[in-house]
Amino acid sequence: MASENMTPQDYIGHHLNNLQMDLRTFSLVDPHNPPATFWTLNIDSMFFSVVLGLLFLVMFRSVAKKATSGVPGKFQTAIELIVGFVHGSVKDMYHGKSKLIAPLALTIFVWVFLMNLMDLLPIDLLPYIAEHWLGLPATRVVPSADVNITLSMALGVFILILFYSIKMKGIGGFAKELTLQPFNHWAFIPVNLILEGVSLLSKPVSLGLRLFGNMYAGELIFILIAGLLPWWSQWILNVPWAIFHILIITLQAFIFMVLTIVYLSMASEEH
């Protein structure tokens, strides 16, 4: 429900502001007067992403410790289904040999899903608690709606792409891949380098921006519904959108995982 002291425009803008720290002074940034500097840290995005990552570790560790060969409980069954699904996806799509890929894919899928799931919380719940109980000027609770988080994850995948490319093909083989494809002639090396360089760099950029764009749009729709409609009518649009958004949340986590597996499989192929 929008604050009585805010116009709809103020309400929407308020919910799109991150809790930021100026790294030059280590002080909180005024969301209404942000500094014109790159050196800021989105504390809320970092906090919720770390907390959700720890939640993932605690959940899976507790299930692993209590796993039995007998009849599993409902929670253990759900975890086993997720693990089996991810393992099957890796087996079908990754053609190299690495023990890292399956755990990485599982971590990405569950972690991104949990970050996306924060979008289903009531839009004012955690920001209200943060503002009135903790005195924080702004709070955004969906880490995957922050481009810094999604591009950071994509950058991690990009580093792994480079690592596996060099590991499987060697530095010379990787250099040849960049300079002698698609035109296998020394005269086309500059053209090949531009084409392959753009293709290589587009992978992390598209990976991060796709997740960010979908989650930012979903978050914005919830904010628009809450900011423009009276409280008693919001459920008419909120409920159908939340139900549909469950599909988006799961699908975006799956796409991020699948593209990571595919990119690493391509990097692991020997030419």
From Swiss-Prot:
Primary location group: membrane
Membrane-spanning segments: 38-58, 100-120, 146-166, 220-240, 242-262
Pfam family, one: ATP-synt_A
Xref: InterPro entries: ATP_syn_F0_a_bact/chloroplast (IPR045082), ATP_synth_F0_asu (IPR000568), ATP_synth_F0_asu_AS (IPR023011), F0_ATP_A_sf (IPR035908)
Localization: Cell inner membrane
Topological category with respect to the lipid bilayer: Multi-pass membrane protein
Annotated PANTHER family: ATP SYNTHASE SUBUNIT A, CHLOROPLASTIC
HAMAP family on file: ATP_synth_a_bact
Primary gene name: atpB
Protein name (Swiss-Prot/TrEMBL): ATP synthase subunit a
Cell inner membrane in keyword set: yes
Signal peptide: none
Gene Ontology molecular-function annotations: proton-transporting ATP synthase activity, rotational mechanism
UniProt keyword Nucleotide-binding, yes or no: no
GO biological process: proton motive force-driven plasma membrane ATP synthesis
Function (record text): Key component of the proton channel; it plays a direct role in the translocation of protons across the membrane.
Cross-referenced PROSITE patterns: ATPASE_A
Matching CDD domains: ATP-synt_Fo_a_6
